[in-house]
Curated annotation (Swiss-Prot):
Primary location class: membrane
SMART domains named in the record: CBS
Protein name as annotated: Chloride channel protein ClC-Ka
InterPro entries in UniProt: CBS_dom, CBS_dom_sf, Cl-channel_core, Cl_channel-K, Cl_channel_volt-gated, ClC
Family stated for the protein in its record: Belongs to the chloride channel (TC 2.A.49) family. CLCNKA subfamily.
Expression induction or repression: Regulated in parallel with BSND under furosemide treatment. Decreased to half in the inner medulla under furosemide treatment. In the renal cortex and outer medulla levels were weak and did not change. Regulation with BSND in inner medulla is limited to the thin limb; levels in collecting ducts were not affected by furosemide treatment. During furosemide treatment selective down-regulation with BSND in thin limb plays a role in maintaining salt and water homeostasis.
PROSITE patterns in the record: CBS
GO biological process, one term: chloride transport
Name of the gene this protein is made from: Clcnka
Length: 687
């Protein structure tokens, strides 16, 4: 009992406790507590999802901007070092190469030592997790720290290594979302909800894209196209709300840091608005889409083939298994040596950063026409107001530098994707596509120097518009997405080329999707992740194939009248996570599901009231409190492969039991379903 020491001031008789009297500022504490309880009540009346999404967007914007700020300082220090070492070729070469070699080897070594799951972009693993597969290690907090440090070091190498930020940052956003979800569940006392978690992870994927490009609309659509096979419209508002908060905060930080006067697009363009293109140019935009589609197929095929070669080659596989930092340093040395500006790098604009590459390629002036009569000298240092001069070397024409840039970056990017470190691969593909479009645009500007005559109006061709279409088409073809067109508009703030850019993206996807799997699907296949392949039911005849053709008939059931000795034998001889519970051994009528963990626990804690020597059955264990689950969904042997595939994808299922007239006859898991789809798509050769 508390010791009472007096009455409250102004009270009619309610006593004051000793703890309350001597506590520090009891009235203030009570007021603060009441205020916090009132605020909590009002906030949760609105809905906790809103606060969760706002916190996620703001937090990811802060992380993205902080990373960009730190990376910018490191890149600036590298340029200063390269500029100040003098004219000696050896010192300049060492200052150019040692920097990325050290950063890349540290990125690979640090990230792999902290978490071996931090390498790559992380998007294939996220796509697998959003389909219902549990990959806990990829959402671990250690993985977050390794990914942040490793990605920062990778991006600090600049355009020398030529890698991006999108994929790993989406992975970081999903990890933050999972962590905040656990905190929220503990705060409000909510049990874990798998469906709710997947909804929040989908919104987090949109936030990751939006806080990299400050593009909320394309961020949501790109995350849907890349991550989801089926998407609920109910999740739309979550994705757009969180992405808008993140993009707004990201651009607002740039204004606060005096980087810009107001919130604008990242890559500003000066395209002609009144007549941006003539009607006959639509044909060339569509042709550009077909070219990007063909080149994307070549890139995807070469990338998968080279990755397979690196993994199977005796020397490279041994080096990757024993010393990943050494492999990263070796690849970085090769790439840095090629991009050394006084060497081959002078012919591929190697002194420009990746952002400056896009700024220059989106220039609306024709470089070929500007250098037709005279070749400007190659500047000693890049001019921020005339970045296009980096593409004009006295020994090469504009077409030569653009073509050389494409050829070199094509295989250099494939080589860089084999390094085991956190890195994104979307931005390099986007820039390569812009160079493809720029090359075609410059060729058309030379072929039609006065523009294509359409009626009485004559308008010069803008190669920057073709660069914009090429960037969207090539990146869309590699990733099998259409939203890259909208991303190009949000990045540049221009929508005057909306129709030709969209037509180019559609043409590129028409070729790529029919010839090659996307970059992320190819990575899923290379890593052998548990992901169901996509099927076209009506085209490959998945309806005639039924469950009875591929189900697992070796089903271990537990009947209620099974003696406990046999139950123990079944549990110890099998390793399945759950058993189908049937009524009797004769009828095999499916009545429920019993988890292995619950069954083992019940067997180990037999009631003391049981008489020794008396035979007991499974139904006695169940009556004693062993929990069972009802069978809410099951397959029929006549269910088609297409229907089973749709159920597994939309409901994120792992396995289902097959019943015929209530009798358990088999089961279907991911393994059987994936094998059936593979056999249907690639039938075995006749014997």
């Amino acid at each position: 009992m508390e010791e009472l020491v007096g009455l409250r001031e102004g009270s009619s008789g309610k006593p004051v406790t000793l703890q309350e009297l001597w506590g520090p500022c009891p009235r203030i504490r009570r007021g603060v507590r009441r205020g916090l309880e009132w605020l909590k009540e009002r906030l949760f009346r609105v809905g906790e999802d809103w606060h969760f999404l706002v916190a996620l967007g703001v937090l990811m914007a802060l992380i993205s901007y902080a990373m960009n700020f730190a990376i910018g300082r490191v890149v600036r220090a590298h340029k200063w070092l390269y500029r100040e070492v003098g004219d000696g070729h050896l010192l300049r070469y060492l200052s150019w190469t040692v920097y990325p070699v050290a950063l890349l080897s540290f990125s690979s070594g640090f990230s792999q030592s902290i978490s071996p799951f931090s390498g790559g972009s992380g998007l294939p693993e996220l796509k697998t997790m959003l389909s219902g597969v549990v990959l806990e290690d990829y959402l671990d907090i250690k993985n977050f720290g390794a990914k942040v440090v490793g990605l920062s070091c990778t991006l600090a190498t600049g355009s020398t290594i030529f890698l991006g930020k999108v994929g790993p940052f989406v992975h970081l956003s999903v990890m933050i979302s999972a962590y905040l979800g656990r905190v929220r569940a503990k705060t409000i006392g909510e049990t874990e909800n798998k469906a709710k978690e997947i909804e929040m992870l989908s919104a987090a994927a949109a936030v990751g894209v939006a806080t990299v490009f400050a593009a909320p609309f394309s961020g949501v659509l790109f995350s849907i196209e890349v991550m989801s096979s089926h998407f609920s419209v109910w999740n739309y508002w979550r994705g757009f709300f969180a992405a808008t908060c993140g993009a707004f905060m990201f651009r607002l930080l740039g204004v606060f840091n005096s980087e810009q006067e107001t919130i604008t697009s990242i890559y500003k363009t000066r395209f002609r608005v009144d007549v941006p293109f003539d009607l006959p140019e639509i044909f060339f935009f569509v042709a550009l889409g077909f070219i990007c589609g063909v080149l994307s197929c070549a890139y995807l095929f070469c990338q998968r083939t080279f990755l397979r070669f690196i993994k199977t080659n005796r020397y490279t596989s041994r080096l990757l298994a024993t010393s990943k930092p050494s492999y990263a340093a070796l690849v970085a040395l090769v790439l840095a040596s090629i991009t050394y500006p006084p060497g081959v790098g002078r012919f591929m604009a190697s002194r420009l950063s990746m952002a400056e590459h896009l700024h220059s390629l989106f220039d609306n002036n024709s470089w070929a026409l500007m250098t037709r009569n005279s070749s400007p000298p190659w500047p000693a240092e890049p001019d921020p107001q005339n970045l296009w001069l980096e593409w004009c070397h006295p020994r090469f024409t504009i077409f030569g530098t653009l073509a050389f840039f494409l050829v070199m970056k094509f295989w250099m990017l494939i080589l860089a994707t084999t390094i085991p470190m956190p890195a994104g691969y979307f931005m390099p593909i986007f820039i390569i596509g812009a160079a493809i479009g720029r090359l075609l645009g410059e060729a058309l500007s030379v072929a039609f120097p006065e523009g294509i005559v359409a009626g009485r109006e004559v308008n010069p061709i803008m190669p920057g518009g073709y660069a914009l279409a090429g960037a969207a088409a090539f990146s869309g073809a590699v990733t099998h997405t259409i939203s890259t067109a909208l991303l190009a508009f949000e990045l540049t703030g221009q929508i005057v080329h909306a129709l030709p850019v969209l037509m180019a993206v559609l043409a590129a996807n028409a070729i790529s999707q029919n010839c090659q799997p996307s970059f992320y699907d190819g990575t899923i296949m290379a890593k052998k992740l548990p992901y169901l392949p996509w099927i076209r039911g009506r085209q490959i005849g998945s309806y005639p194939v039924t469950v009875e053709h591929f189900m697992n008939c070796n089903l271990t059931t537990l009947a209620k009248d099974t003696p406990l000795e046999e139950v123990v034998k079944v549990v110890t001889s099998t390793e399945v996570s759950q058993y189908p519970l049937v009524e009797t051994r004769e009828s095999q009528t499916l009545v429920g599901i019993v988890e292995r963990t619950h069954l083992v626990q019940a067997l180990q804690t037999q009631p003391a009231s049981w008489a020794p020597g008396q035979e007991r059955f499974l139904q006695d264990i169940l009556a004693g409190g062993c929990p069972t689950q009802p069978v809410t969904l099951q397959l029929s042997p006549e269910t088609s492969l297409y229907q089973a595939h749709s159920l597994f994808e939309r409901l994120t299922l792992q396995s289902l039991f097959v019943t015929s007239r209530g009798k358990a006859v088999g089961s279907v898991s991911w393994a059987e379903l994936k094998k059936a789809i593979s056999t249907l798509i690639n039938p075995p050769a006749p014997k």
